[in-house]
């Protein structure tokens, strides 16, 4: 009858499935894409290693075998463990803590070999000497009494698997990375300097163009001012000449006064307005001449005279 062993195996398998589900759920919550088969394989490899190296799996199965033997009437294992199985709750809590510690140590890379050696031996330093004394713990003594210690006559020089760091190569790698980063920074800086120089050149060129345009605008403004002054002088001379010519004409005083008022109303400051005023004056003169001609034409008709334009 192996019902307890089967139950323990089922619990271990369920724990593995729970570990896989926890890992995939965590990756999904973090928004990380993953391959389920790869996660399953990695978790299984780590889970099997931790459970086997820590001894948790064998410990649970051993207790299950002891319970099955007791159920089958074989109390040898149960009697052998009665000294420490005094309280089931205390023992269960103690086993739980020990199993946690074993799995934690296994996950940190402290394998079973290292844990057993640390538990079986301790080192005592001798003050003032470079040598030391290796002391066997009670666990080592119990193992010797139980015949769990073997003497290997063949000497095997096994190198301890210790992660060594080649600081020189690490420094060389960091130096290469630093040089590469320095080169990239210099390239970007040089590129930025070239762009800045080009921008400055364009800015100076634009400033020169603006300066030339400003000079041209100033010249044009000066020319316009001169032209405006010449036009103002010309219009003033024109008005004076027309007034003098008007006074020399044999026209009625009211006609002369009317024309002089129109001449004085010409804007001599603004040439555009002056041209408009002169145009208005010319139109009025033509209109007066047209009215005079119509009056003369009507008078000739009343006197039974005919006229002809040659």
Swiss-Prot record:
Coiled-coil regions listed in the entry: 163-234
Family per similarity comment: Belongs to the rotavirus NSP3 family.
Localization (cell): Host cytoplasm
Protein name (Swiss-Prot/TrEMBL): Non-structural protein 3
Species whose genome carries this gene: Rotavirus A (strain RVA/Human/United States/D/1974/G1P1A[8])
Keywords: Coiled coil, Host cytoplasm, Host-virus interaction, RNA-binding, Translation regulation
Classification via Pfam families: Rota_NSP3
GO cellular component, one term: host cell cytoplasm
Molecular function terms from GO: RNA binding
Keyword Coiled coil set for record: yes
Function text: Plays an important role in stimulating the translation of viral mRNAs. These mRNAs are capped but not polyadenylated, instead terminating in a conserved sequence 'GACC' at the 3' that is recognized by NSP3, which competes with host PABPC1 for EIF4G1 binding. The interaction between NSP3 and host EIF4G1 stabilizes the EIF4E-EIF4G1 interaction, thereby facilitating the initiation of capped mRNA translation.
Annotated transmembrane regions: none
Spans annotated as RNA-binding: 1-146
Chain intervals for the UniProt region annotation (Dimerization): 147-203
Source taxon at top rank: Viruses
Renumbered residue ranges of the record's region Interaction with host EIF4G1: 205-310
SUBUNIT field: Homodimer. Interacts (via the coiled-coil region) with host ZC3H7B (via LD motif). Interacts with host EIF4G1.
GO biological process, one term: regulation of translation
């Amino acid at each position: 009858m192996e019902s307890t062993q089967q139950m323990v195996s089922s619990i271990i398998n369920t724990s593995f499935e729970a570990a896989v589900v926890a890992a995939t759920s965590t990756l999904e919550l973090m928004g990380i894409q993953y391959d389920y088969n790869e996660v399953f394989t990695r978790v299984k490899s780590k889970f099997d290693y931790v459970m086997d190296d820590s001894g948790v799996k064998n410990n649970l199965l051993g207790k299950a075998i002891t319970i099955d033997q007791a159920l089958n009437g074989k109390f040898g294992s149960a009697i052998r463990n009665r000294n420490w199985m005094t309280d089931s709750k205390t023992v269960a809590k103690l086993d739980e803590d020990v199993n946690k510690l074993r799995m934690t140590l296994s996950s940190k890379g402290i394998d079973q070999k290292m844990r057993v050696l640390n538990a079986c031996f301790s080192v005592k330093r001798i003050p003032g000497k470079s040598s030391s004394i290796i002391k066997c713990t009670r666990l080592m003594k119990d193992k010797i009494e139980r015949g769990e210690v073997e003497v290997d006559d063949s000497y095997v020089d096994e190198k301890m698997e210790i992660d060594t760091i080649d600081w020189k190569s690490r420094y060389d790698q960091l130096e290469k990375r630093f040089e590469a980063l320095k080169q990239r920074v210099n390239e970007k800086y040089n590129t930025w300097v070239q762009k800045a120089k080009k921008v400055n050149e364009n800015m100076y060129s634009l400033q020169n163009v603006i300066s030339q345009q400003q000079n041209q605008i100033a010249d044009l403004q000066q020319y316009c001012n001169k032209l405006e002054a010449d036009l103002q002088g010309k219009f003033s001379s024109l008005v004076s000449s027309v007034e003098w010519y008007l006074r020399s004409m044999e026209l009625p005083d009211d006609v002369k006064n009317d024309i002089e008022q129109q001449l004085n109303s010409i804007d001599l400051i603004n040439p555009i307005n002056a041209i408009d005023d002169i145009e208005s004056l010319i139109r009025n003169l033509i209109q007066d001449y047209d009215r005079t001609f119509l009056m003369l034409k009507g008078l000739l008709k009343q006197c039974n005279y005919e006229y002809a334009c040659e």
